[in-house]
Protein backbone atom coordinates (compact mmCIF):
# COMPACT_ATOMS: atom_id res chain seq x y z
CA UNK A 1 0.00 0.00 0.00
CA UNK A 2 3.07 2.26 0.10
CA UNK A 3 3.79 1.62 -3.58
CA UNK A 4 3.47 4.44 -6.12
CA UNK A 5 -0.17 4.97 -7.20
CA UNK A 6 0.68 4.38 -10.85
CA UNK A 7 -1.68 1.51 -11.68
CA UNK A 8 1.10 -1.09 -11.81
CA UNK A 9 0.68 -2.31 -8.23
CA UNK A 10 -2.58 -4.10 -7.49
CA UNK A 11 -3.71 -5.62 -4.22
CA UNK A 12 -5.65 -8.88 -4.09
CA UNK A 13 -7.99 -8.28 -1.16
CA UNK A 14 -10.02 -10.82 0.80
CA UNK A 15 -12.29 -11.13 3.83
CA UNK A 16 -9.35 -11.22 6.22
CA UNK A 17 -8.73 -7.55 5.43
CA UNK A 18 -12.12 -6.40 6.72
CA UNK A 19 -11.83 -8.71 9.75
CA UNK A 20 -8.27 -7.71 10.64
CA UNK A 21 -9.17 -4.01 10.53
CA UNK A 22 -10.80 -4.54 13.95
CA UNK A 23 -9.07 -7.70 15.16
CA UNK A 24 -5.61 -6.10 15.26
CA UNK A 25 -5.53 -2.85 17.20
CA UNK A 26 -2.08 -1.66 16.11
CA UNK A 27 -1.88 -2.08 12.36
CA UNK A 28 0.52 0.30 10.65
CA UNK A 29 -2.08 1.19 8.06
CA UNK A 30 -5.78 1.97 7.83
CA UNK A 31 -7.38 -0.55 5.49
CA UNK A 32 -10.27 1.68 4.44
CA UNK A 33 -8.26 4.92 4.26
CA UNK A 34 -5.21 3.55 2.45
CA UNK A 35 -6.97 1.51 -0.27
CA UNK A 36 -8.43 2.62 -3.58
CA UNK A 37 -11.12 -0.01 -4.32
CA UNK A 38 -11.21 -1.29 -7.89
CA UNK A 39 -13.67 -4.19 -8.12
CA UNK A 40 -15.04 -7.24 -6.44
CA UNK A 41 -13.87 -10.50 -7.99
CA UNK A 42 -15.70 -13.45 -6.45
CA UNK A 43 -17.49 -14.57 -3.32
CA UNK A 44 -17.74 -18.04 -1.92
CA UNK A 45 -19.98 -19.51 0.70
CA UNK A 46 -19.02 -21.33 3.82
CA UNK A 47 -20.92 -24.49 4.59
CA UNK A 48 -21.90 -25.58 8.07
CA UNK A 49 -20.81 -29.22 8.27
CA UNK A 50 -21.05 -31.72 11.10
CA UNK A 51 -19.47 -35.07 11.75
CA UNK A 52 -22.03 -37.80 10.94
CA UNK A 53 -21.95 -38.88 14.60
CA UNK A 54 -23.89 -35.74 15.53
CA UNK A 55 -27.52 -36.93 15.91
CA UNK A 56 -29.09 -34.19 13.77
CA UNK A 57 -29.82 -34.00 10.06
CA UNK A 58 -31.28 -30.48 9.79
CA UNK A 59 -30.28 -27.07 11.09
CA UNK A 60 -33.38 -26.69 13.32
CA UNK A 61 -32.57 -30.08 14.88
CA UNK A 62 -28.97 -29.00 15.42
CA UNK A 63 -30.03 -25.75 17.10
CA UNK A 64 -32.42 -27.63 19.40
CA UNK A 65 -29.79 -30.28 20.18
CA UNK A 66 -27.14 -27.67 20.96
CA UNK A 67 -29.47 -25.76 23.27
CA UNK A 68 -30.39 -29.01 25.02
CA UNK A 69 -26.77 -30.11 25.41
CA UNK A 70 -24.77 -27.08 26.54
CA UNK A 71 -21.02 -27.51 26.30
CA UNK A 72 -21.25 -30.69 24.25
CA UNK A 73 -20.72 -29.22 20.78
CA UNK A 74 -17.19 -28.19 19.84
CA UNK A 75 -16.81 -25.82 16.89
CA UNK A 76 -13.53 -26.02 14.98
CA UNK A 77 -12.03 -23.08 13.13
CA UNK A 78 -8.86 -22.22 11.24
CA UNK A 79 -7.78 -19.99 14.11
CA UNK A 80 -8.97 -17.25 16.42
CA UNK A 81 -10.29 -14.39 14.30
CA UNK A 82 -10.28 -16.41 11.08
CA UNK A 83 -13.18 -16.12 8.66
CA UNK A 84 -14.25 -19.61 9.79
CA UNK A 85 -14.33 -18.38 13.40
CA UNK A 86 -16.23 -15.13 12.96
CA UNK A 87 -18.74 -16.82 10.65
CA UNK A 88 -19.44 -19.33 13.43
CA UNK A 89 -19.59 -16.64 16.11
CA UNK A 90 -22.16 -14.72 14.05
CA UNK A 91 -24.24 -17.90 13.92
CA UNK A 92 -23.94 -18.40 17.68
CA UNK A 93 -25.08 -14.84 18.32
CA UNK A 94 -28.02 -14.91 15.94
CA UNK A 95 -29.21 -18.47 16.69
CA UNK A 96 -28.79 -18.08 20.44
CA UNK A 97 -26.65 -21.19 20.90
CA UNK A 98 -23.46 -21.92 22.80
CA UNK A 99 -20.65 -23.91 21.21
CA UNK A 100 -17.10 -24.36 22.46
CA UNK A 101 -14.67 -22.75 20.03
CA UNK A 102 -11.63 -24.90 19.22
CA UNK A 103 -9.08 -22.91 17.18
CA UNK A 104 -6.53 -24.70 14.99
CA UNK A 105 -3.52 -23.46 13.06
CA UNK A 106 -5.22 -23.46 9.70
CA UNK A 107 -8.15 -25.23 8.09
CA UNK A 108 -6.54 -28.62 7.23
CA UNK A 109 -5.94 -29.77 10.84
CA UNK A 110 -9.38 -28.51 11.86
CA UNK A 111 -10.98 -30.47 9.04
CA UNK A 112 -8.97 -33.57 9.96
CA UNK A 113 -10.30 -33.51 13.52
CA UNK A 114 -13.84 -32.87 12.28
CA UNK A 115 -13.62 -35.91 10.01
CA UNK A 116 -12.38 -38.05 12.91
CA UNK A 117 -15.06 -36.81 15.29
CA UNK A 118 -12.72 -34.99 17.70
CA UNK A 119 -14.85 -31.89 17.09
CA UNK A 120 -18.47 -31.83 15.98
CA UNK A 121 -19.05 -28.84 13.71
CA UNK A 122 -17.21 -26.40 11.49
CA UNK A 123 -18.04 -23.51 9.20
CA UNK A 124 -15.72 -24.40 6.34
CA UNK A 125 -15.06 -23.01 2.87
CA UNK A 126 -17.30 -24.92 0.49
CA UNK A 127 -14.52 -25.97 -1.94
CA UNK A 128 -12.63 -27.52 0.98
CA UNK A 129 -15.54 -29.55 2.39
CA UNK A 130 -17.28 -30.46 -0.86
CA UNK A 131 -15.29 -33.66 -1.59
CA UNK A 132 -15.98 -34.94 1.94
CA UNK A 133 -19.67 -34.08 1.65
CA UNK A 134 -19.94 -35.97 -1.63
CA UNK A 135 -18.13 -38.94 -0.06
CA UNK A 136 -20.59 -38.99 2.85
CA UNK A 137 -17.88 -38.22 5.40
CA UNK A 138 -19.42 -34.89 6.43
CA UNK A 139 -23.05 -33.85 6.72
CA UNK A 140 -23.96 -30.38 5.44
CA UNK A 141 -26.64 -28.57 7.43
CA UNK A 142 -26.68 -25.19 5.68
CA UNK A 143 -24.72 -22.75 3.55
CA UNK A 144 -23.93 -19.29 4.84
CA UNK A 145 -24.79 -17.19 1.79
CA UNK A 146 -28.20 -15.60 1.24
CA UNK A 147 -29.05 -18.02 -1.59
CA UNK A 148 -28.46 -21.72 -2.18
CA UNK A 149 -25.45 -22.93 -4.11
CA UNK A 150 -25.50 -24.62 -7.49
CA UNK A 151 -22.90 -27.04 -6.12
CA UNK A 152 -25.20 -28.01 -3.21
CA UNK A 153 -28.72 -27.24 -4.42
CA UNK A 154 -30.42 -29.45 -1.82
CA UNK A 155 -28.72 -27.72 1.13
CA UNK A 156 -30.70 -24.80 2.64
CA UNK A 157 -29.24 -21.50 3.76
CA UNK A 158 -28.68 -20.64 7.41
CA UNK A 159 -30.95 -17.66 6.79
CA UNK A 160 -33.84 -20.01 6.00
CA UNK A 161 -33.97 -20.76 9.73
CA UNK A 162 -32.06 -17.86 11.30
CA UNK A 163 -33.59 -14.77 9.66
CA UNK A 164 -31.09 -12.15 8.56
CA UNK A 165 -28.04 -14.39 8.75
CA UNK A 166 -25.62 -14.09 5.82
CA UNK A 167 -21.87 -14.51 5.61
CA UNK A 168 -19.43 -15.19 2.82
CA UNK A 169 -15.78 -14.97 2.01
CA UNK A 170 -14.73 -12.82 -0.90
CA UNK A 171 -11.92 -11.68 -3.18
CA UNK A 172 -11.44 -8.31 -4.81
CA UNK A 173 -8.89 -5.90 -6.20
CA UNK A 174 -7.59 -2.63 -4.83
CA UNK A 175 -4.77 -0.21 -5.53
CA UNK A 176 -2.76 2.22 -3.40
CA UNK A 177 -4.68 5.28 -2.32
CA UNK A 178 -4.42 8.28 -4.66
CA UNK A 179 -4.26 6.10 -7.76
CA UNK A 180 -5.86 8.38 -10.41
CA UNK A 181 -9.57 7.79 -10.95
CA UNK A 182 -9.03 7.30 -14.68
CA UNK A 183 -6.64 4.42 -13.95
CA UNK A 184 -9.05 2.89 -11.44
CA UNK A 185 -11.87 3.00 -13.99
CA UNK A 186 -9.69 1.44 -16.69
CA UNK A 187 -8.54 -1.35 -14.36
CA UNK A 188 -12.13 -1.95 -13.30
CA UNK A 189 -13.25 -2.42 -16.90
CA UNK A 190 -10.35 -4.75 -17.73
CA UNK A 191 -10.90 -6.91 -14.64
CA UNK A 192 -14.64 -7.18 -15.21
CA UNK A 193 -14.05 -8.07 -18.86
CA UNK A 194 -11.59 -10.81 -17.89
CA UNK A 195 -13.89 -12.47 -15.36
CA UNK A 196 -16.78 -12.45 -17.81
CA UNK A 197 -14.91 -15.10 -19.82
CA UNK A 198 -17.06 -18.30 -19.89
CA UNK A 199 -13.99 -20.47 -19.29
CA UNK A 200 -13.17 -18.59 -16.09
CA UNK A 201 -16.78 -18.84 -14.91
CA UNK A 202 -16.79 -22.58 -15.55
CA UNK A 203 -13.51 -23.07 -13.70
CA UNK A 204 -14.81 -21.23 -10.65
CA UNK A 205 -17.95 -23.36 -10.61
CA UNK A 206 -15.79 -26.49 -10.76
CA UNK A 207 -14.18 -25.40 -7.50
CA UNK A 208 -17.61 -25.44 -5.85
CA UNK A 209 -19.46 -22.52 -4.34
CA UNK A 210 -17.61 -19.63 -5.98
CA UNK A 211 -19.71 -16.89 -7.55
CA UNK A 212 -18.33 -14.04 -9.64
CA UNK A 213 -19.03 -10.65 -8.06
CA UNK A 214 -17.86 -7.87 -10.39
CA UNK A 215 -18.69 -4.36 -9.22
CA UNK A 216 -17.95 -0.72 -9.82
CA UNK A 217 -15.29 0.97 -7.68
CA UNK A 218 -18.02 2.81 -5.74
CA UNK A 219 -19.98 -0.39 -5.12
CA UNK A 220 -16.87 -2.20 -3.92
CA UNK A 221 -15.96 0.70 -1.63
CA UNK A 222 -19.43 0.58 -0.06
CA UNK A 223 -19.17 -3.19 0.38
CA UNK A 224 -15.78 -2.93 2.10
CA UNK A 225 -17.11 -0.40 4.60
CA UNK A 226 -20.20 -2.52 5.31
CA UNK A 227 -18.22 -5.74 5.72
CA UNK A 228 -15.73 -4.06 8.06
CA UNK A 229 -18.56 -2.75 10.24
CA UNK A 230 -20.30 -6.14 10.29
CA UNK A 231 -17.27 -8.06 11.53
CA UNK A 232 -16.33 -5.31 13.96
CA UNK A 233 -19.65 -5.88 15.76
CA UNK A 234 -19.04 -9.64 15.92
CA UNK A 235 -15.43 -9.30 17.10
CA UNK A 236 -16.33 -6.84 19.85
CA UNK A 237 -19.43 -8.69 21.02
CA UNK A 238 -17.66 -12.07 21.14
CA UNK A 239 -14.47 -10.45 22.53
CA UNK A 240 -12.33 -12.18 19.90
CA UNK A 241 -8.60 -11.72 20.27
CA UNK A 242 -5.86 -12.70 17.80
CA UNK A 243 -3.70 -15.68 18.67
Predicted segments with their positions:
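Paired acidic/hydrophobic, glycine-rich loop segments that form the ligand-binding mouth/hinge
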Residues: 6-13, 74, 120-124, 140-142, ...
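A ligand-binding cleft/hinge motif common to bilobed small-molecule-binding domains
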Residues: 17-26, 90-94, 121-154
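An extracytoplasmic/periplasmic, membrane-proximal ligand-sensing/linker region
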Residues: 94, 134, 179-243
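Hinge/capping helix and adjacent helix->loop/strand transition within the periplasmic-binding protein
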Residues: 2-9, 22-109, 158, 163, ...
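Short helices/loops that flank or line small-molecule/ion binding pockets
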Residues: 1-5, 90, 94, 108-118, ...
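Non-transmembrane alpha-helical segments in soluble domains
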Residues: 1, 60-63, 111, 115, ...
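A short structural motif in glycosyltransferase catalytic domains
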Residues: 101, 123, 213-214
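Short, flexible active-site-adjacent loop segments at beta-strand->alpha-helix junctions, enriched
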Residues: 14-17, 54, 79-81, 144-147
Amino acid sequence: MRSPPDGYTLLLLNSSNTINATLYERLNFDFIRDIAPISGLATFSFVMVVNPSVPTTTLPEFIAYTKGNPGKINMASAGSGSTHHVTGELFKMMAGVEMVHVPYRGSPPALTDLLSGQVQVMFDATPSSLPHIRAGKLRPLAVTTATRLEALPEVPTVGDFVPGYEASSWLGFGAPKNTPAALIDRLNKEINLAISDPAIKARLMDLGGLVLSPSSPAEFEKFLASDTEKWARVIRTANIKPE
